Amino acid sequence: EHYGFRGHEHRAAEKFLSQQGISKPSAPILAPEFTNPLFLKTCCQALRQNKQTSFPKGLNSITSLFEFYVDSIERIVARKKKFNPQENIVKSILIDIASKLLPDNLDGLPKHDVRKLINNYDPNPNFGDSLFDILIDEGILSEDISYKEEQRGNLIVRFTYERFSDYFIAQELVNKVDRIEIAFSNGGSIWQLLKDNGYYRF
């Protein structure tokens, strides 16, 4: 496991940003993902690509930070694959993957399925590396080995950051219901999902 800047978070992140020519945020970003060197490197790369030297204001919430990160990946991948980042191809891929994780695949999806899913989104499949390989290389997705009994030892692909996965899964759940209070109430769709899978047992 990679522990990033753990134990020296603010000092190490500040030094890294300085080396990248990026000003540190005016307000501390407390999300643990911000202490991960790969996460921070991706954000800095996107800023430099846009000729920016500072982070936008308002990254203090998880939602704003993750949206900024996805936008960063989107711009980097769009440049490599020659498409318009406003097409939101990467975001569409992540939403599609998240929709297939619940309820039985929270650890990840079979690699061959994810490769096919991602490459179906590729607007320029004959240009450069495959979209699947680029997303793995950029670190937004990771390859792993399944430990589920029926798939033990098989290669799977998952979101690199667990909270990032949680964020997209939560968005998918909420987007599928008309009234959130009913979905969480006794017998509602989300209530039933949590109950059946024992996600919140006390």
Where are these regions (language model features)?
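Extended hydrophobic
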Residues: 2-179, 184-195
